[in-house]
Amino acid sequence: MGAIERHPGHWRWVGGPVPPGAAAITIGSVVCIRPRAAGDARLLRHELVHVAQWRRLGYLGFLRRYLLAYAWWRAHGHGHVAAYRRIPLEVEAEWQAKTGRDDRAG
């Protein structure tokens, strides 16, 4: 099942349920991460951006934006990975994970 740990602002579930092909997934304030990826600092930063997005948008707001963006890209001929990488919430999380910058604040 895996270890569930409380951290400031989120719960981390190492060994929790993660979709096939993914290293981690965040639902609300719970970050589920594969054991092999638990030490990946960039991945954790990425997932913590999702925690902030869930908090900012709420459950329905996050899911609506995420799923509609994914569906739009799929409907426009992109495969799963390409559509996923174009979801604005994923783009934001990846940018902040790589740069440490939150350009929305400026």
What are the functions of these language-model segments?
Residues 37-53:
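Short alpha-helix carrying the canonical HExxH Zn2+-binding catalytic motif
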Residues 1-26, 35, 58-106:
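Metalloprotease/metallohydrolase-associated module, dominated by Zn2+-dependent proteases
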